[in-house]
Amino acid sequence: MPRYKLTIEYDGGPFCGWQYQDNGPSVQGALEAAVKAICGDAVRVHGAGRTDAGVHALAQVAHCDIAKHFAPNRLRDGLNAHLRPHPIGVLTAEIVPDTFEARFSALRRHYVYRIANRRANLAIDVGHVWRVPRPLDTLAMHAAAQRLIGKHDFTTFRDTECQAKSPEKTLDQLDVVRNGDTVTIVTSARSFLHSQVRSMVGSLVWVGHGRWSADDLSNALAERRREACGPVAPPDGLYLVRVDY
């Protein structure tokens, strides 16, 4: 039975997240329905990142085992045909060894968070960036962000419903870059806790507004209490952009 690796992009706005939820449609569910329409069997599609409701992906990775053999390009095209009502695109399909696991074989996950730092309302990017009207000091944000690099207990920056066994994660990158009125936060790690990226982004925005200093961010991390976190950024601006293997 061949195992297929899929690289997928999607607009997370209409979905309750990657994973099955009782409260609405999921990306996983839409993909599995498309696979079933092609091969006739119920097949589980496993994703590398369980993105939350409203979070987007430019290159989510998934794998599935299909009893019938398909040429990878034919599988890709067939899935896209059945996914057409949804804002989901299968970019590539390839046959991989059966030892490959989209989630557990991943070496690093890369996310980008986009902020529109402007007074004007959004006309084009509604649902795809976080509009922050007050000016942000991105140099202060970037400097403070470096306090979070490395291995830490990120209890402060994880959702209270996070199911990870340990709150310890190693953060490899957290950069804040401005290009005009667009502020981009780039982060990478082998894995992240539930809501960790959005929690870090919201706290960095407090730094950008001058409400917190870099020391305040460090102190919040050290407290290891969810209540010590700043605001949680909305999902609109968050994108899973790459998974390394």
From Swiss-Prot:
GO terms for molecular function: RNA binding; tRNA pseudouridine(38-40) synthase activity. Transmembrane segments: none annotated. InterPro entries: PsdUridine_synth_cat_dom_sf, PsdUridine_synth_TruA, PsdUridine_synth_TruA_a/b_dom, PsdUridine_synth_TruA_C, TruA/RsuA/RluB/E/F_N. Substrate binds at Y111. The keyword Isomerase applies. HAMAP family: TruA (MF_00171). Homodimer. This is tRNA pseudouridine synthase A. It comes from Nitrobacter hamburgensis (strain DSM 10229 / NCIMB 13809 / X14). The lineage of its organism: Bacteria, Pseudomonadati, Pseudomonadota, Alphaproteobacteria, Hyphomicrobiales.
